[in-house]
Structure formats: C-alpha cells, structure tokens
Amino acid sequence: MKLNKYIDHTLLKPEATKEQIEKVIEEAKEYDFASVCVNPTWVKLAAEGLSGSDVKVCTVIGFPLGATTPEVKAFETKNAIENGADEIDMVINIGALKSGNLDLLERDIQAVVEASGEKLVKVIIETCLLTDQEKVLACQVSQKAGADFVKTSTGFSTGGATVEDVALMRQTVGPDMGVKASGGARSYDDAQAFIKAGATRIGASSGVAIMKGETASGNY
C-alpha cells in the first residue's frame, strides 16, 4: 500500500475555521489520502467537498475525553453517519477501564459499533494515560466488542503515539485488526517507523509534510 493511503489527514483543533477545513479537504484530494478526519460539526462540509473522490470522511465521537455515556456516543455516531461520515474514531471510557469496569467499557464500544452499521470503527484508547496492562486490556475489549481498529491517541492529552505502543497493540490484536497511530507522526521517517511497528493507519495533521519528506511542527 502506498504511504498516502495510510494517512488520515486530520484537523481536530477546536478553533479550526471553515477555510482551514476546506484547505485540508483540498489537500486530501490532491494527495489521495485515506481520509479526512474532522470534528462532527464539519462532517457535512467534508462529505460535500470529498464527493466523487476516494477519500473517506472520518470523524470523532466522545472526543477528546471519552467520558460521555454509551447512549450519547451512539447518538453522536448515528448523527455523524447521517451527515456523511464513513469512519468513526471513538474515545473509550478511560475511567471505566481504570476502575476495572470492563463490562461498561465493552458496552461503551459496542454501542458505537452497533450504531455505526457497516461503517469502520476505530477505538481510541489514549495510551499516554494507561499502563501497559491497561493498553492490552483496552485492545482486547475493543476486539471483543467488534471494532475494526484500535487507535493510540486523541492528540489532545499528555502524549501521542509511540513506536513501542503501536508494537504492543499490534502484538495484542494480531494480524486481523487495524492499528492506528496518531499524535506523533510529523515526518516521513516517523510514519515509516509506525508502519514497521504494525500501524495500518496514521492520523496526522502533518500529512502533506510527510508526503513531501519534510518535518512538521504540532502535536497531532
């Protein structure tokens, strides 16, 4: 697979303007990225802008804290799909995981999986807040709940993806589930390191810099 098709071209900062979102959409079409990842308020604009292209519309649910209820996440998911979303990146209930409430954690993920129908679901586990044991548990529960991907990070917490976390996640889920590295790829070399570790998708605001072989600044 070509590098461009690993990249979810991402703009999730709360202050993003319509003009900035439109720029990301145009860049994604130019480089034929896997998707554009935007907040739910921009999904309709992205769907219109990407109509007729191969670039998917990705959005985020329960973002960035993951601390809403399963019912709210399910509603958000359905609303996003009605507006044109093809892929759903949800944040887990991190507190449930930390409290050992794996039933709630699974129900949280399942609610989004069921609401998404046939759409792709990626589960953000926020690795920077977890122990290695919790990372493994989060991946196992995501897999059991029927998600398509596990994803490292929101890009809005204390840290982003590391090669070590990607490798651990890949080792945990095996070959049949996607692993998305986000919040750490700022250069071509970063992207290649994540792919080598087992990532099948990379979330980055630096997609253009990565494709040009440059290094970008920023935290996502």
UniProtKB/Swiss-Prot annotation:
Swiss-Prot/TrEMBL GO biological process terms: 2-deoxyribose 1-phosphate catabolic process; carbohydrate catabolic process; deoxyribonucleotide catabolic process
General function of this protein: Catalyzes a reversible aldol reaction between acetaldehyde and D-glyceraldehyde 3-phosphate to generate 2-deoxy-D-ribose 5-phosphate.
UniProt key word Acetylation: no
Cited SUPFAM superfamilies: Aldolase
Cross-referenced CDD domains: DeoC
Active site, renumbered: 89 (proton donor/acceptor), 151 (schiff-base intermediate with acetaldehyde), 180 (proton donor/acceptor)
The protein's name in its UniProt record: Deoxyribose-phosphate aldolase
